[in-house]
């Protein structure tokens, strides 16, 4: 019996520890590269959508709308449009990643990898958060040329952008698995 066990013993038994950091990083990088390959569709398109909303709403409402909490309406509108794109793209990235994997049949490649469910979920969530934060940064840069944006606390902006995108990307994973 010992001879059989030695004959079929795996020679290079790889031990990952509690977390498979290499697999986690690889999946995260795969998800980030998935949206960076089509940057016009994933980064520029949400920016153009936000700009169109900004222009259409500012033209439709115009100067008829007074100030909101002491700020001009367009200054009040711009952060809301940025937040809208952050949560929308976080949800879209994670749910479409799962759905595309299910439809194309390549989700089995991820499921066969030595990754736990938490590692797969966290890598997908963080990739969606990365996409959302990139969209937020690009939108802030472009909107700052059009609208006077006022920042009161950068730490709050970073924390709430990350948490909002993380929550919506988690919901996107649930919807992607359920659909």
How does the language model describe each region?
Residues 89-115, 125-128:
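Transmembrane helix boundary and interhelical loop/hinge segments in multi-pass membrane proteins
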